Amino acid sequence: MSKAKELQEAGLRLFQEGLYDEAAQRFSEALEHYAEEGKEIEAAEMLNNLGIIRRKQERWEEAAEAVEEAKRIFARLGDKSREAQAWGNLGGIYASMGKRDKAMEAWQAAIGLFAEIGDEDKQGETMMSLGIALFKDGRRQEGLAAYQAGLQMVKHPTTMQQVTRVLMTIQAKLFSLGF
């Protein structure tokens, strides 16, 4: 196993333990090693990981900068899946910053890319995030429609998502009956 990969795995373990500063250090070191080895995709993954850590730490600007850079690299290299994931991460960061319009734009970009590559699960999850943002923005009907459409796309819904599906189906039936 390469030194970069070892550092990456150590970073993931530390992240899962909630040791964010230590995880960020390992990811930064892995980033340097991957860059030296000319492994741009892996280096960009480390940037994306750093962005996720900075979001957890509420260091919004650093989070956005890291994920933006990762997104640019993924786009340049033609990795649409990772680019879409980075767009989705940016949506979450912008939403946390209270920049709802930028969050919605980022999620829409992610949804488009996920649709392009046929990843319905991630497309659905992202549509649900967009739906929540639209709902909070006062665009209730549009938000509910996006959330419901996203919920239907998720192949392996959580228990809560399954319950929500049932409730939305009941609501639609009652509405169609005039209740």
Predicted segments, located by residue:
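Conserved alpha-helical positions within TPR/SEL1-like repeat arrays
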Residues: 5-18, 25, 32, 41-56, ...
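TPR/TPR-like (Sel1-like) alpha-helical repeat modules
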Residues: 107, 128, 132-158
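Terminal, low-structured helical/coil segments at or just beyond the last alpha-helical repeat
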Residues: 144-147, 151-179
